[in-house]
Amino acid sequence: LEEIKQLKKEGLLKKNVLLGLGSNGLATEAQFDDLMTEIGDRQVYLINTRVPTQRWQNEVNALFDQMATKYENITLINWYQASDGQPDWFREDQVHPSEQGLIEYTGLIARNVLLP
């Protein structure tokens, strides 16, 4: 949130905002609402997560689904679905993307942002 506020203050927050939690933990609806207040009417591309080793994975993805419904300016990029059944896209820890996974992740983002 602080980074978004700083970018906005400096006039550097662009019309398209890419948000990805990655594999780093929980977010709450209140935190997300605060973030969306700062972002305003900009187009937001929200990437959900695949972290099968963490119990919060499904909770976060459910929150992201809810937020994509709540806010018209959010496009959900479904990394969870795209990476399903693709163990070679991840390192041995089943969390961090492999080289192939990084290619697929980047391609998924590009397709959603550039070819809506």
For each of these PLM feature ranges, what is it?
Residues 1-34, 51-62:
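Conserved SGNH/GDSL esterase-like catalytic core that processes O-acyl groups on lipids
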Residues 15-21, 43-48, 75-78:
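Structural recognition of the beta-strand scaffold that forms the well-ordered cores
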Residues 55-116:
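Catalytic His-Asp segment of secreted/periplasmic serine-dependent ester chemistry enzymes
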Residues 33-41:
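Catalytic-core regions built around general acid/base machinery
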Residues 10-12, 39, 69-70:
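Extracellular/periplasmic catalytic domains that process cell-envelope and extracellular macromolecules
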Residues 14-16, 41-45, 83, 97, ...:
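Functionally constrained cores in energy, signaling, and assembly domains
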